[in-house]
């Protein structure tokens, strides 16, 4: 898996001299104690799975970290002008984090809502059973799903009142949906 060039650029600006591609509780342990290929680190940052967060808590006396990340929450505003598969994938990326996540698609397009509803089971079938169960719980419960708004203003109102951690705009004209 390639590391995003923007991440590498930011790391270079911050003076990072070495990057290890690793994840999960095992990455926290490797950073806390060191391994043959990963030197012991002073600090580990960033969000992660519940196992990653638990490992950071357990090893807090061995490696520094800020407060653990909470559940993920996202609202994706989709105006229907782009591929529904993108909306489905983006919402699954957040909803698979755990049952305490929240993930909504907000749209004024009934067609997009129907397309995403049809596509989601196909993509969930490709996920691990655990991640698919998380996504299913989030997307069929009170913390997620598809909100079909009557007007764009109603969509904006819902998004602003919910005030999610992440808000994405999926539109062929994204600037039209950003307040001046």
Per-region residue spans from a language model:
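Nonpolar helix-loop interface/hinge motif
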Residues: 155, 159-160
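Short acidic active-site motifs
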Residues: 6, 27, 151-154, 176-177
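Structural motif
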Residues: 3, 79-80, 108, 150, ...
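Short hydrophobic alpha-helical runs that function as membrane-insertion/retention elements
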Residues: 1-2, 18-21, 104, 167-170
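Conserved small-residue-rich beta-alpha loop and adjacent elements
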Residues: 1-9
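Conserved NAD(P)+-binding/catalytic subdomain of aldehyde/semialdehyde dehydrogenases
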Residues: 13-104
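C-terminal core of ALDH-fold dehydrogenases
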Residues: 161-180
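Flexible, acidic loop-helix segments that line cofactor/substrate-binding pockets
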Residues: 68-75, 97-148
């Amino acid at each position: 898996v390639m590391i995003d060039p923007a991440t590498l650029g930011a790391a270079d600006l911050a003076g990072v001299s070495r990057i290890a591609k690793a994840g999960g509780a095992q990455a926290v342990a490797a950073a806390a104690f060191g391994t043959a290929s990963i030197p012991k680190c002073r600090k580990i940052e960033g969000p992660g799975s519940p196992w990653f967060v638990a490992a950071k808590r357990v090893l807090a006396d061995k490696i520094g970290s800020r407060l653990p990340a909470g559940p993920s929450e996202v609202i994706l505003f989709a105006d229907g002008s782009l591929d529904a598969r993108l909306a489905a994938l983006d919402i699954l990326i957040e909803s698979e984090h755990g049952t305490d996540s929240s993930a909504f698609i907000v749209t004024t397009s009934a067609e997009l809502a129907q397309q995403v509803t049809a596509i989601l089971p196909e993509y969930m079938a490709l996920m691990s059973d655990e991640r698919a169960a998380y996504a299913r719980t989030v997307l069929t419960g009170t913390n997620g799903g598809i909100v079909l708004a009557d007007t764009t203003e109603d969509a904006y109102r819902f998004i602003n009142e919910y005030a999610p951690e992440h808000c994405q705009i999926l539109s062929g004209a994204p600037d039209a949906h950003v307040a001046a």
